[in-house]
């Protein structure tokens, strides 16, 4: 296919046009006094959003050369969202500021490769300074403040603080669309997996359509149980112990084995419940091992030379309660050894750090949460569908920001952490003039998020930046900054205006990375448009038959 090419200043001008177009749409959403953006959908109601990455993902320009600039800048927002889950607008604002200042230097004759080298050196120093500023997240109030700032909603902040209190910092929180007009949350006590009872005959509470066992024995196996001879020894052992409650977790239970369990349940001889094992393949084996450790049992598997008929009471797990409906089973307060459970959690956390797959990481985090007994569901409601989707996006941002804050700590918000990092550039050693120029570009760009926050609040950005510096000198306190909601200069940490260090760091790293790519681009290549076909009527065949 034929290609179109443009070079040098013409290429950089096209990139700049695309970058400025995207940034203009995204940066209007920055801060608590930023505006919303409405996104048209081909079907359904339009989406109204305050989320920078949602706006960025929607933008495609007709001009293919300018669109390359859009796609490059979009990477700063998307990558920041992937790593930290928030801070996408900050990344876009920083990247645009670095690119615009850098392009002026390139147009004046500066070497782009040396500029990039200076940006990379400065970036390393700035990231180190941001990490130095970070304070470990300790109190419930700090968690609430992080969530409130990210969602720009005090109710969301309070709810997330409450949920994190109850499920712990290793817990899993999922966000769903609710059916009411307000926020709701559910806490799942114990380990839940998405397999329900095999037969409705196991139900003990017909009003709730649930099967409930108190202090049951738990048989865990990865094989299919069809023959009664496989189950008979363990059934006799359970009954001889004086207990009647038994949970069977297996690949499947059918045939005479299922019939025997159901008949004994109906006669009242045995209060049994059979459920299928969760997951598939290797993940199933791992999850069965999790259940065994949680309940103090053993997985009966032919892979380790154990047959089902050889199982004894010592191989069975125990729990305070088991509850199952047609879709889910919950094991509450397993009797497993606490040290073994903690060792398993530590092992899973190690796997989380080493895995490169986002899907595997998510599944591992779920397993950690289930072992530590913390899973919560937040249901987001609103009067209309667009409002509900917009609020759900903000709740997800707040959740990601809270997790990031737990991970790497917190820094002063309102763009002040970046402002406070600027002196770190004074200690960077440079070899070439362009490297020194790049450090000056960063000095100017790091002020831009604060300028934009002030601009969105209707203030003069440059005046606010200068006033913040004066207030910091006056109070000898680097935590002073501008509260855009009240229009006053306050100690941001005391006022609860804080950002996760991971979010600020990721935004800066990705902005510098994208800016370096743009500044060192000398040629653009895109597909040439195909010539339009003429709308003539095709000739008719001869009627000679």
Curated annotation (Swiss-Prot):
GO molecular function: ATP binding; ATP-dependent protein folding chaperone; isomerase activity; unfolded protein binding
Localization annotation: Cytoplasm
E.C. number(s) listed in UniProt: 5.6.1.7
Enzymatic reactions: ATP + H2O + a folded polypeptide = ADP + phosphate + an unfolded polypeptide
Single biological process term from Gene Ontology: response to heat
InterPro entries according to UniProt: Chaperonin_Cpn60_CS (IPR018370), Cpn60/GroEL (IPR001844), Cpn60/GroEL/TCP-1 (IPR002423), GroEL-like_apical_dom_sf (IPR027409), GROEL-like_equatorial_sf (IPR027413), TCP-1-like_intermed_sf (IPR027410)
Positions with a binding annotation for ATP: 29-32, 86-90, 414, 499
Annotated keywords: ATP-binding, Chaperone, Cytoplasm, Isomerase, Nucleotide-binding
Any single Pfam family the record assigns to this protein: Cpn60_TCP1
A single cellular component GO annotation: GroEL-GroES complex
Highest taxon in the source lineage: Bacteria
Subunit architecture: Forms a cylinder of 14 subunits composed of two heptameric rings stacked back-to-back. Interacts with the co-chaperonin GroES.
Family: Belongs to the chaperonin (HSP60) family.
Cited NCBIfam families: GroEL (TIGR02348), PRK00013.1 (NF000592), PRK12849.1 (NF009487), PRK12850.1 (NF009488), PRK12851.1 (NF009489)
Role of this protein: Together with its co-chaperonin GroES, plays an essential role in assisting protein folding. The GroEL-GroES system forms a nano-cage that allows encapsulation of the non-native substrate proteins and provides a physical environment optimized to promote and accelerate protein folding.
Protein known as: Chaperonin GroEL 2
């Amino acid at each position: 296919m034929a290609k179109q090419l443009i070079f040098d200043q013409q290429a950089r001008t096209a990139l700049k046009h695309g970058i400025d177009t995207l940034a203009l749409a995204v940066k209007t959403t920055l801060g608590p006094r930023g505006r919303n953006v409405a996104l048209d959908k081909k079907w359904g109601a339009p989406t109204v959003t305050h989320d920078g990455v949602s706006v960025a993902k929607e933008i495609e320009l007709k001009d293919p050369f300018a669109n390359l600039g859009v796609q490059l800048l979009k990477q700063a927002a998307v990558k920041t969202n992937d790593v930290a889950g928030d801070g996408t607008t900050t990344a876009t604002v920083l990247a645009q500021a670095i690119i615009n200042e850098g392009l002026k230097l390139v147009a004046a004759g500066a070497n782009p490769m040396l500029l990039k080298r200076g940006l990379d050196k400065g970036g390393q120093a700035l990231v180190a300074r941001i990490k130095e500023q970070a304070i470990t997240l300790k109190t419930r109030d700090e968690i609430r403040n992080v969530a409130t700032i990210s969602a720009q909603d005090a109710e969301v902040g309070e709810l997330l603080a409450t949920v994190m209190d109850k499920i712990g910092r290793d817990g899993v929180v999922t966000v769903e669309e609710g059916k009411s007009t307000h926020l709701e949350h559910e806490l799942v006590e114990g380990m839940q997996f998405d397999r329900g009872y095999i037969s409705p005959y196991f139900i003990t509470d017909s009003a709730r359509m649930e099967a409930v066992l108190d202090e049951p024995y738990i048989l865990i196996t990865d094989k299919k149980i069809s023959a009664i001879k496989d189950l008979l020894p363990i059934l006799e052992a359970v009954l001889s112990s004086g207990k009647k409650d038994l949970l069977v977790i297996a690949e499947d239970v059918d045939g005479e084995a299922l019939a025997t369990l159901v008949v004994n349940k109906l006669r009242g001889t045995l209060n049994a419940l059979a459920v299928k094992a969760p997951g598939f393949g290797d993940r199933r084996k791992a999850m069965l091992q999790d259940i065994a450790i949680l309940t103090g049992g053993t997985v009966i598997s032919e892979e380790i030379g154990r047959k089902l008929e050889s199982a004894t009471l010592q191989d069975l797990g125990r729990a305070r309660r088991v509850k199952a409906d047609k879709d889910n089973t919950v094991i509450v307060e397993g009797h497993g050894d606490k040290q073994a459970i903690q060792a398993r959690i530590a092992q899973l956390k190690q796997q989380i750090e080493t895995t490169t797959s986002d899907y595997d990481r998510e599944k591992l985090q779920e397993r950690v949460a289930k072992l530590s007994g913390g899973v919560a569901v937040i249901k987001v409601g609103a009067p209309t569908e667009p409002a509900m989707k917009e609020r759900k996006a903000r709740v997800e941002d707040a959740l990601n920001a809270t997790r990031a804050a737990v991970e790497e700590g917190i820094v002063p918000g309102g763009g002040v952490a970046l402002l406070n990092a600027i002196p770190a550039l004074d200690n960077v050693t440079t070899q070439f003039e362009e490297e020194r120029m790049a450090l000056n570009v960063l000095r100017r760009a790091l002020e831009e998020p604060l300028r934009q926050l002030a601009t969105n609040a209707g203030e003069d950005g440059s005046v606010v930046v200068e006033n913040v510096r004066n207030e910091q000198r006056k109070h000898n306190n680097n935590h002073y900054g501008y509260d855009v909601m009240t229009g006053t200069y306050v100690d941001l940490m005391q006022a609860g205006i804080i950002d996760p260090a991971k979010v600020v760091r990721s935004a800066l790293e990705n902005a510098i990375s994208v800016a370096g790519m743009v500044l060192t681009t000398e040629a653009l290549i895109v597909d040439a448009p195909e010539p339009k076909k003429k709308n003539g009527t095709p000739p008719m065949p001869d009627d000679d038959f």
